[in-house]
């Protein structure tokens, strides 16, 4: 009986949260209800005042002088700020409501700005695009040496006077080690499926092997690729991420409003818990449910690996060093975009009703991935002189043919089963 009451309470709480996210601010706690009421006119007036102050619209003539280049930069940033403010207030809400629906509307606006910036970059030539990056970070626009991790694969280097295990030491303390662990933790929290995570982990190592003739950065030693990447960094990130998933999956989501917390400490904990999920969905991908679902899940994996490959090719083509903040900003933005994208795509797959279109974030993610790929292809002309090895062409051609035959056989088998049931 108590379990049924808890279930009804949780279901009612979820309905209340969804209704409030759709604009029912009166359903929220009295202390925080004002955060969910529309403040469009107030923000418009405050924004107008900020524009007056920043632009000097009411200043006397000649009171504030800026060069043409500075004025253009200020104008572009103001244009982006106005657009993001509009998106935060007016963009469509997503299925995510924590910490606030406006946060995900802002992420939606950032994704659109990034897509538009990529479209602009696509219409430049390679040299102009590299020099354009100086406007984002002054140190860019300079050709960089690309590090090769496979130049010396010895585990023990006896002639090195400082460290006999210098190769292992430099690999372990490379910035990509931390990036691998954090990246796979983030993927595990988003995807929540161990099988897909290992497919992505091994698949990306195959991508590095495939494109090592193009990017020196992908030329890794066998122990770096198999032991350090897959069995240590990726495994630890997936392990930590799946433990995080199980932690949130085991919690009971019965939220009590801030005003109903009996103590100051309770109010602080409730405020901090606003940055945790309102409820936890078990994403069931079922890749072997049928040929169509297999292709849909495989498509998700292909997009994931393409986005990761774009990171390295964009750095190479645009001369962006690995430690430049722009690399980190892009990865953070992609992570923020991917969170609602995965939720939308999984809801699209699990919806039993015939859904005609995917969510806005799914569309934006695919569009950004395509434009990034087009930039890599356009700016990569003439940079990669070594042809793909013949054995790689044969290998991937065989994989493609085997995949097509497998899907056709699977589809034919399902068709025969359906025909037998009809008889």
UniProtKB/Swiss-Prot annotation:
It comes from Oryza sativa subsp. japonica (Rice). Belongs to the CDP-alcohol phosphatidyltransferase class-I family. One of its GO terms (cellular component) is endoplasmic reticulum membrane. It is a multi-pass membrane protein. It comes from the Eukaryota. The keyword Transmembrane helix applies. Its EC number is 2.7.8.8. GO terms for biological process: phosphatidylethanolamine biosynthetic process; phosphatidylserine biosynthetic process. It is an enzyme of class 2 (transferase). InterPro entries: PSS (IPR004277). Catalyzes a base-exchange reaction in which the polar head group of phosphatidylethanolamine (PE) or phosphatidylcholine (PC) is replaced by L-serine. One of its GO terms (molecular function) is L-serine-phosphatidylethanolamine phosphatidyltransferase activity. It catalyses: a CDP-1,2-diacyl-sn-glycerol + L-serine = a 1,2-diacyl-sn-glycero-3-phospho-L-serine + CMP + H(+). It is found in: Endoplasmic reticulum membrane. PANTHER family: CDP-DIACYLGLYCEROL--SERINE O-PHOSPHATIDYLTRANSFERASE 3, PHOSPHATIDYLINOSITOL SYNTHASE. The chain crosses the membrane at residues 38-58, 77-97, 103-123, 195-215, 222-242, 294-314, 319-339, 359-379, 390-410. Pfam families: PSS (PF03034). This is CDP-diacylglycerol--serine O-phosphatidyltransferase 2. Pathway: Phospholipid metabolism; phosphatidylethanolamine biosynthesis; phosphatidylethanolamine from CDP-diacylglycerol: step 1/2. Keywords: Endoplasmic reticulum, Lipid biosynthesis, Lipid metabolism, Membrane, Phospholipid biosynthesis, Phospholipid metabolism, Transferase, Transmembrane, Transmembrane helix.
